[in-house]
């Protein structure tokens, strides 16, 4: 089993954790329906960038 030889410093620990922060999802409002959706995704009613792309 691997065992560390030296204790990692607070600085090294912080540098390792610098990429662990969570980000909120980016939301957009559709031009035609005004519906909120994830960026670069189709809305629930089938619109993407103001165009109907999925027929239900």
Curated annotation (Swiss-Prot):
InterPro entries: Ribosomal_bL32, Ribosomal_bL32_bact, Ribosomal_zn-bd. The keyword DNA-binding does not apply. The keyword Ribonucleoprotein applies. One of its GO terms (cellular component) is large ribosomal subunit. GO terms for biological process: translation. Pfam families: Ribosomal_L32p (PF01783). It comes from the Bacteria. Keywords: Ribonucleoprotein, Ribosomal protein. Residues 1-37 are annotated as: Disordered. GO terms for molecular function: structural constituent of ribosome. Belongs to the bacterial ribosomal protein bL32 family. This is Large ribosomal subunit protein bL32.
